[in-house]
Regions:
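Active-site acidic/histidine proton-transfer and metal-coordination neighborhood
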Residues: 18, 70-165, 174, 242
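Acidic/histidine-rich catalytic cores of soluble enzymes
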Residues: 32, 63, 122-222, 226
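Short, contiguous strand/loop micro-motifs
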Residues: 6-8, 35-37, 73-75, 109-111, ...
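A short, acidic, amphipathic alpha-helical segment used as a generic capping/interface helix at domain edges
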Residues: 223-238
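Short acidic/histidine-rich active-site segments
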Residues: 244-246
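N-terminal pre-domain/capping segments
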Residues: 1-97, 128, 164, 190, ...
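Short, conserved clusters of charged catalytic residues that mark active-site
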Residues: 16-19, 44, 118, 149, ...
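Short, hinge-like loop/turn segments at secondary-structure boundaries
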Residues: 24-25, 49-52, 78-81, 117, ...
Length: 246
């Protein structure tokens, strides 16, 4: 396992973008996962944020997160397409080769599997000219897709070369999804793995998962699922995953 494939996420740090970049470099990491908020919220503007990232010398693992894209229609869908285009352009400017898209939580979104696949197929096609991959993640409180086997089914149905999965240990443990389901996934279609833990054994409702994710998520080794995190990483390594971790 190559330690250069590990890098932190800016949403885990306080302070300015420049301070986060400096801290990551000082800790010996070579890459960083960026939040769009770090870029658009920079006090000197988006171009200054992009320049700071480039000057840091850190490789950008990916950009997060496109929310509530799939399953909408009409003006809502058109709006989300515009948001996706803007985020893809931001990825391109930052040198990020992966855009993280999480499963929809919108009450307006349909759960029709065919439409979900069509929408993600469209998103992947938008990313092709910029040579960006889409990593689709099952949020544990997603409205229709909340476990990674469901996300994998949608990705398979969409059948685009640049559309794959993001696997997040928090969401997997929050829904108590068995790791055995990883055996059904093609390791080449896993584009990103995110590692974190939380402070208790289970979360019993979507609301509980949201609260836990926002206020009680901790680094691997600091929560109550340390053995499961290690098992998760070993399983990924065993199935041939050689991509990035954040």
């Amino acid at each position: 396992m190559n330690l250069d494939h590990f890098g932190p996420d800016t949403i885990t740090f306080a302070g300015s973008l420049e301070a986060k970049l400096a801290a990551v470099r000082a800790a010996g990491f070579t890459q960083i996962m960026l939040s769009a908020g770090d870029i658009v919220g920079h006090p000197e503007g988006e171009q200054a944020a992009i320049a700071a990232v480039r000057a840091s010398g850190l490789r950008v693992t990916g950009l997060q997160v496109l929310r509530d894209f799939e399953g909408l229609s009409g003006h809502l869908h058109a709006y989300k397409v515009d948001v996706a285009r803007a985020m893809l352009e931001m990825c391109h400017a930052l040198g990020a080769q992966v855009l993280l898209a999480c499963s929809s939580t919108s009450r307006h979104a349909t759960g029709d599997p065919e439409q979900l696949a069509r929408d993600l197929s469209k998103l992947a096609l938008l990313a092709v000219p910029l040579q960006i991959r889409i990593a689709y993640e099952a949020l544990s409180w997603g409205r229709h897709v909340n476990e990674f086997p469901q996300a994998w089914n949608v990705v398979q149905s969409a059948d685009r070369a640049n559309l794959g999965l993001a696997l997040d240990s928090f969401h997997i443990f929050a829904t108590s999804t068995g790791l055995g389901a990883l055996r059904e996934i093609d390791a080449r279609k896993v584009y990103l793995v995110q590692l974190s833990d939380f402070m208790w054994q289970e979360t019993r409702s979507p609301e509980d998962r949201i609260e836990t994710a926002r206020h009680f998520r901790v680094f691997p080794g600091e929560g109550v699922h340390s053995e499961q995190v290690a098992e998760f990483v070993r399983a990924l390594d065993g199935m041939g995953y050689r991509g990035d971790y954040s």
